[in-house]
Amino acid sequence: MPTTYQAPGVYVEEVPSGSRPIEGVGTAVAAFVGFTEKGPTNFPVRVTNWTQYQNTFGGFIRNGYTPLAIYGYFANGGGNAWVIRVGGEVVSQPAALALPGRAATAVDSLRVTSLLPGAEGNDITVEVADVEAPPAPEGGESGGEAEGGRFRLTVNAPGRMPEVFDNLSLRRGDPRNAVDVVNNPETGSKFIRLEDLAPRGVSLAERRPAPQTYQLAGGSESMTALVPADFQGDVASRSGIEGLEALDDVTMVVAPDIMKAYQDGLLDMEGVIGLQKAILAHCMRMEDRVAILDCPPGMNPTEVDDWKMKVANLVSDGGYGALYYPWIKVDDPASRQTVFIPPSGHIAGLWSRTDDRRGVHKAPANEELLGVIDLETHLTQAELGNLNVHSINCIRAFPGRGIRVWGARTLAEAASEWRYINVRRLFNFIKESIDQGTQWVVFEPNDESLWARVRRDITAFLTRVWGTGALFGATTDEAFYVKCDRETNPPEIIDAGMMVCEIGIAPVKPAEFVIFHIRQITPGATE
């Protein structure tokens, strides 16, 4: 801006308003800790869609629930997510089979090895059938082989088109040599590889595989030794659950593979409970995120209630965790079957969808879980009531309405002010928004002018929050108050280098129990 004006004319100048609006922070960023097919280990990676996840961490696997959970997260409306791959390396043993020859001495003919990973190859079948020899050329010998005939190999893999390799031979150098034809990288099989096992000196007739259908076996996937510390990790190395401390934008923590490790014998129940409590402790320490926990598999309502109340004793006084039951059935592309998995990944996606459509103040309940086929357990009304009282959020199937989440409680005590998920997450949102929006205050002169600006900015922000329906009250005076003055900042507080602002908020709470009183009346009667 010029200090003097010499030329006649109109001058338009920008003048700082002094207002620093507080913007709302994101509320739906999930962090997944678990097993994946590939990718960096113990290093957080951000993904925003399923394709990005596949490019970094691979596809679905048989020995982990994390890929299915993340797929369900995106399918249910999830957006940003952090993924931390934990655990040892996956050791894959391909399925294989030796095809027997026709010799009386039981000479093996061919070894068939699956190209599909691990146990997936166990579903491959190989059918051997004899074929007629081609007609003899004019003036020549029979087109059949003098020491053995030709055969057809049909390869069947579930969910794929059969592969047929006809007129095969075991004669070395033959254009239709079985090993060369099937193993051809361009025109050969996509499911198997062959290896000639017969020693030299054995006739073709004896080496030719016996005609029948064979099924491959022995395929498996296993993980090298896993200990709870692999899941828990530490902040310094940015590994495991503790490594999430370095990620400021995380609002949900999900670890479904704790249950997979338990099922596979890599963790005992004590280890499972210890890790779930470690996640709760992490969320309580960070005060800006909520843990979405899973119940163990195969438990009926009575068993899961006893487990939660007597065995696990999962409690979060500040409401920084939520527990869901039962497991859900989904399609598993890795096994090409339906499987039961922990619901936490799908739940995280539903939380995100609810935030996006209604706001973080809306309880993430009475909303449909997408991509879910069935439930491991169907609950009665009495069972639902008992579990709800003990802060176990249930998932129910409703005729004509799909499979829905039917609970919105945290792991806080029933009488706690942090009983509801939406209240806890609304306060997290408001706290983080004010924290980030008032960073400019640090080292400003601590006087009444500063207090007034802080009151103004926070009041404007909370007025917008109230306008979305997140706060209870017909007016802003009923919905909240902001106090930052001489009373909250006496001389001893100022001398200590502090500025104190007191904020009171009246959050909306869900209508958990809807009660209609209906009675008979006499026609024509008045109240």
Residue ranges of model-derived segments:
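Extended, Lys/Arg-rich, non-catalytic nucleic-acid recognition/anchoring regions
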Residues: 106-197
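Short, solvent-exposed coil/turn linker segments
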Residues: 49, 137, 169, 177, ...
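Generic detector of low-complexity/intrinsically disordered segments
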Residues: 99-101, 112, 170-172, 196-199, ...
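Long, low-complexity, polar/charged, intrinsically disordered or flexibly structured peripheral segments
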Residues: 198-237
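Generic structural signal for beta-strand residues in well-ordered domains
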Residues: 25, 144-146, 172, 176-187, ...
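Acidic/proline-rich low-complexity IDRs
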Residues: 96-98, 167, 193-196, 203, ...
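Structured, hydrophobic secondary-structure cores that serve as assembly/anchoring elements
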Residues: 1-117, 142-161, 203, 212, ...
